[in-house]
Amino acid sequence: MEQNSYVIIDETGIHARPATMLVQTASKFDSDIQLEYNGKKVNLKSIMGVMSLGVGKDAEITIYADGSDESDAIQAISDVLSKEGLTK
């Protein structure tokens, strides 16, 4: 299992467009990928799960990946978070 933590810097947090990009990216991998915020974990392959967390600015999130392609999954998700302006 691999994990990485991030602080969200976008003024509106994880809103619909970047959430969609995260879900699409996570769905490309076989690994089980979870997003944790405020003690609650959701499947990062579920748009409803991601949006239900209401992740705002300055929130600390952790991404967990467990499976055969976990390293690639964490890297790809990190790239999306950065590209979408959610993290530095």
From Swiss-Prot:
Family: Belongs to the HPr family.
Domain HPr: 1-88
Classification of source organism: Bacteria, Bacillati, Bacillota, Bacilli, Bacillales
InterPro entries assigned: HPr (IPR050399), HPr-like (IPR000032), HPr-like_sf (IPR035895), PTS_HPr_His_P_site (IPR001020), PTS_HPr_Ser_P_site (IPR002114)
Protein name from the UniProt record: Phosphocarrier protein HPr
Catalytic center residues: 15
Phosphoserine modified-residue sites: 46
GO BP terms, alphabetized: phosphoenolpyruvate-dependent sugar phosphotransferase system
Any Gene Ontology CC annotation: cytoplasm
Location of this chain's protein in the cell: Cytoplasm
Keywords from the UniProt entry: Cytoplasm, Phosphoprotein, Phosphotransferase system, Sugar transport, Transcription, Transcription regulation, Transport
Main location: cytoplasm
UniProt xrefs under Pfam families: PTS-HPr
Gene name of the record: ptsH
Purpose: General (non sugar-specific) component of the phosphoenolpyruvate-dependent sugar phosphotransferase system (sugar PTS). This major carbohydrate active-transport system catalyzes the phosphorylation of incoming sugar substrates concomitantly with their translocation across the cell membrane. The phosphoryl group from phosphoenolpyruvate (PEP) is transferred to the phosphoryl carrier protein HPr by enzyme I. Phospho-HPr then transfers it to the PTS EIIA domain.
Notes on activation and inhibition: Phosphorylation on Ser-46 inhibits the phosphoryl transfer from enzyme I to HPr.
The keyword Transcription is assigned to this record: yes
